[in-house]
């Protein structure tokens, strides 16, 4: 009833979830147990979410079927291979690692460690790592090499001959590769461009859609919530 009351007074879903956690902590401190994951409470939360339509308000996640369509469209473009390998690597790395778009463009050559199992990428700093302690994301080889982020990135590194500095760079004068790092806005524009080319309305998607798509797809596959959050860097379950 308390959550419903807050909801009718305009509280957001993120606020309701924080309040629920706080209530659970207070009960614990007083020696009482409150199961915040009790079916009745979960049903109440889901009912509020449906009424608010909170899922529809945000940008949509790019799920695996759309991810494959994007990669197929990139491969079919009448562009130089070097451009296609850059763009497909951005998309595949961004999705498979649950990266924020600013994390994608911040990757340097020295952050990459190709290992027999796949690829380790060092993240020197992120939105939720304000002290710059850094962490590592590990990406395995995929069975289907066409959609494998590790295979794609290897080809991009080889064709671009990048051996230091930013991994994802701008092109100047056609297909000439510069030393300048891409901006995170460029990642968002690339996503929208290829969605449109695939016949998918891009207005409901953003640069965040790769990361949320990874989290959603992993959850639907049965991956534990804390494992997903460790990969994406989420501090809460609010996508």
Task: Name each region found by the language model.
Residues 1-239:
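Extended, non-catalytic subsegments within catalytic or DNA/protein-binding/adaptor domains
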């Amino acid at each position: 009833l308390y959550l419903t009351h807050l909801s009718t007074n305009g509280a957001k879903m993120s606020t309701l979830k924080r309040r629920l956690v706080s209530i659970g902590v207070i009960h614990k401190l007083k020696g009482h147990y409150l199961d915040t994951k009790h079916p009745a409470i979960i049903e109440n939360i889901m009912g509020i979410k449906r009424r608010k339509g909170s899922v529809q308000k945000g940008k949509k996640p790019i799920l695996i079927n759309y991810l494959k369509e994007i990669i197929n469209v990139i491969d079919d473009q009448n562009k130089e291979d070097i451009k296609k390998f850059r763009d497909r690597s951005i998309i595949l790395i961004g999705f498979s690692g649950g990266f924020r778009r600013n994390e994608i463009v911040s990757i340097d050559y020295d952050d990459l460690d190709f290992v027999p199992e796949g690829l380790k990428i060092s993240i020197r700093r992120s939105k939720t790592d304000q002290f710059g302690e850094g962490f590592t994301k590990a990406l395995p080889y995929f069975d289907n090499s066409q959609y494998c982020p590790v295979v794609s990135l290897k080809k991009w590194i080889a064709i671009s001959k990048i051996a230091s500095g930013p991994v994802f760079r701008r092109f100047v004068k056609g297909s000439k590769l510069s030393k300048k790092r891409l901006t995170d806005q460029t990642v968002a524009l690339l996503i929208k461009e290829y969605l449109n080319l695939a016949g998918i309305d891009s207005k409901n998607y953003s640069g965040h859609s790769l990361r949320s798509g990874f989290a959603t797809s992993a959850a639907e596959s049965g991956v534990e919530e804390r494992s997903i959050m460790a990969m994406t860097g989420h501090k809460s379950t609010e996508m």
